[in-house]
Amino acid sequence: MVTKPSSTSAAGSLTHSPALAHVRDAGLVLAGTLALTLIGQITIPLPFTPVPISMGTFAALGVGAVLGSRRGALSALLLGALAAVGAPVLAGWSGGTVVTFGYVVGYVLIALIAGRAATVWSRHSGSMASRVATGVVLMLLASASVYVPGLIWLKVATGASWSTALSLGLVPFIVGDILKSVVATGLLPARSRLR
């Protein structure tokens, strides 16, 4: 007589084990932090500002979109914590609470909003054009959120006026952020494949 394994067999219980789910989540958070670290190394320094053009914001959009809000935000929080204690995880393999550290804090906001955008994408019942338009708007919002802590930190760290902080830390990056947001919208469908 041939019997089917029950859903409570040893193998079955491992695949649905809360402990295994926590290990998987931890692994995904670490992978997200690694992605933020490695992709964040891609920078173009600008001679007129301490803030470089960075692919870190694109990485935060991608990590949030693929891993979801919770795991994406935890990945960014871990990156920020490592940087704060001096680990070389920031652009140029630097660490510490440098003048651009506020943007790293902003990666948490980006990941939260991008993760939410992926959820909205997966539940959106409209046409593909409507889904893409909604996705782009949400990814633009996610990308823009980095400027709240980024500009505040830049202003405080440099002692600059608000107008100077905006000209150093926002204006040069608007076009690039729009492009990154549009491209990152293509990652939104990946979230439904990674639960």
Question: Over which residues does each language-model region extend?
Answer:
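Structural signal for the C-terminal ends of transmembrane alpha-helices
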Residues: 66-70, 113-122, 190-194
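Alpha-helical transmembrane segments in multi-pass membrane proteins
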Residues: 28-39, 60, 64, 75-83, ...
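Membrane-embedded alpha-helical hairpins and interfacial helices in multi-pass inner-membrane proteins
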Residues: 49, 93, 121-195
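Short helix-perturbing small/polar motifs within transmembrane alpha-helices
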Residues: 2-17, 24, 38, 93-151
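Hydrophobic transmembrane alpha-helices
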Residues: 2-73
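Residue-level signature of transmembrane alpha-helical entry/exit and packing/kink sites
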Residues: 21-29, 53-60, 72, 99, ...
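Interfacial aromatic-anchored transmembrane helix boundaries in multi-pass membrane proteins
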Residues: 41-52, 80-111
